C-alpha cells in the first residue's frame, strides 16, 4: 500500500508515474483522509478534493482511512466512494453537498454550515491543509487588511462575518 509522496498527501498522475515503476506494479493507494489522529482537535468534514481525476488506470485499488469518529467520517467516505466510482466526472463540491443532504436530509443546511467551517486540519507535521470557511474568506481578508493597514474595521466585511457567525450558532 502507498500513501503518496508523504504520509498524508493527495494522489495524482505524476506521483503514480513515479512510484509504479519502483513497485513494478500499479500502486494500491491507502489515502490517509479523512483520518485526523494527527490533529485530534479537528474534524475533517469538508469536500474531498485534490486527487487526480485521471488516475484510475494507474492504480490497483484505492482505500480511504477514516477518522476515529465513524459518523463524522461518513461525509468524506460518501465523496471518496463517489470519486472512486466515477473519477472523470467527479465534482467535489456537488458530491459534498449530496453527502450532507443524504446523511442529514431534515437539517442538511445546518450540517453544511458546520462542515464548511470544520474542514482544515490546521497546522500539522504533515503539512496537509484543506480549504475552510471558503464563503467568508474574502470578508475575513478585508477585515484583516483594514485592521492591519488602517487600524479600522471594514463595516461591510464585519456584517458578512457576523451573519455567518449567526448561522453557525
Q: What would you call each of these model-derived segments?
A:
Residues 85, 89-169:
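C-terminal functional modules
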Residues 1-88:
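Catalytic-core regions of glycoside hydrolase
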